[in-house]
Every structure is written in C-alpha cells, then in structure tokens.
Amino acid sequence: MAPVRRILLKLSGEALMGPDSFGYHAGTMAGFVGQIRDVVALGVQVGIVVGGGNLFRGATGALAGMNRATADSMGMLATVMNALALKDALQQAGVAARVQTAVHIAHVGEGFERDAAVRELEAGRVVIFGGGTGNPFFTTDTAAALRAAEIDADLLLKATKVDGVYTADPNKDPDARRYDTLSFDEAIAKQLGVLDTAAFALCREQKLSLVVFNVFKPGALKRVVMGEDEGTRVSNH
C-alpha cells in the first residue's frame, strides 16, 4: 500500500522527556527523529505540532494561582522551545526542517503562514508548528487539528504512550479493550478523552481522519502512514 501524501503529527512535550521528569531525553528524541526520517524518505510530507508539557503547562500554572491567559502564554513559549529542539535534532540527522510559530518571534522562527508552510512541505521539508493556536485557553491538540485542516493533511496522528484508544485505562483495567476504529461521534459521546472536545469537533467538521498510536513502538509511525494495522483510527465512518 502506498503511503499517505501529507500528515500532521501531534507530539506531546511529555513524550520528549522520555523516562525523565523534565526537559529532553536524548535517546527518546533520537528514536522519534529516526521514525520521522523514515517516513520523509517515503516521500510523505510531514507537519508537526509539539506540546510543551515537558517544560511548562499553562493549566498547571493556573492551578498555582497564575492568571490563566498568562500561564497559557508561557505554555505556548514552551512549545516554541520544543519546536526549536526538534528542528535541531532533525537537522543533525540530515532532515531539512523549518519552524513556524503561531505568533511571530523574530530570529526564532517564521510566523505561521499557510501558503508558505505548504510550499515547505512540498519541497520535502518537515514543518514544525510552535506556539499552539496563538491564543490562551486552547490546547495543543486543538492546534494540531487546526494546522492539519489548514495544510490539508490526509491524516492527523496523535502520538501517545499507548497503542490506541481503549474502553478504559489499560494501565488500571485489565479488561480494557482497544478499539480498531471509532467514529468522532462515539469518541465524543463516550468521553474517551483522547483529544479535547474542540479538537474532535474540528476533525469531524473537516472530515479529517485521526490515528492514535504508540510512538514509542519502533517503526509505528511508518506503519501508520503505510495504512497497516497500527493504533486506532477515528473518522466520520
């Protein structure tokens, strides 16, 4: 089966720290970069939205008494730091990459511009979108759905630590069962919590298929883009 043309990969900040409790884990980063390099080699155009939870979470700051808008702005800056770290790791591995930020930050990355992003993707460069949506109160999951729709991605891929969507937390419930496929309506109605409601709704409205998979499994990203049985696919059916 031929790979998809263009994907948007949502990579959490927590994933970047691997087994550590903060920052970046070199071995984990190298593993992600290797998987991304493999799909780029297939001719797949790759956009990435990265979270910031390994450095700062806006919701956590708000719980500590910060103004939520201020805390979310700090969280958005954390995602830009992660975008730069990921770009550097990709470039050191020989993968051309660019950073676009939701708000313009001079000398750090280009401000997001849809046509420019598509040109970079078509030229074979990985485009990493930092800064979330550029607005407080929106998660990076929503940013991923938004950017996926804007760049006309064929698939939105949510990279997680589990190999799909389950009926319950598989770490707590031994009877939890993995879904092979789901509709967005089912996922929202059952409050499965894989994405926030705004992100789910945007995917549903834009008819954007989502695959939830375990990015820590070697080769999982390549199997997803090749259409193999990996993770859980969520769509409008």
Swiss-Prot record:
Single GO cellular component term: cytosol
GO MF annotation terms: ATP binding; UMP kinase activity
One biological process term in Gene Ontology: 'de novo' CTP biosynthetic process
Main location: cytoplasm
Pathway of action: Pyrimidine metabolism; CTP biosynthesis via de novo pathway; UDP from UMP (UMPK route): step 1/1
EC number(s) reported in the record: 2.7.4.22
Residues that coordinate or bind UMP: 52, 72, 133-140
Catalytic function, reaction form: UMP + ATP = UDP + ADP
Positions contributing to ATP binding: 10-13, 53, 57, 160, 166, 169
Localisation: Cytoplasm
Regulation of this protein's activity per its record: Inhibited by UTP.
Keywords, ordered alphabetically: ATP-binding, Cytoplasm, Kinase, Nucleotide-binding, Pyrimidine biosynthesis, Transferase
Record's function text: Catalyzes the reversible phosphorylation of UMP to UDP.
Subunit structure: Homohexamer.
Assigned protein family: Belongs to the UMP kinase family.
Protein name (database record): Uridylate kinase
Originating organism: Thiobacillus denitrificans (strain ATCC 25259 / T1)
Gene: pyrH
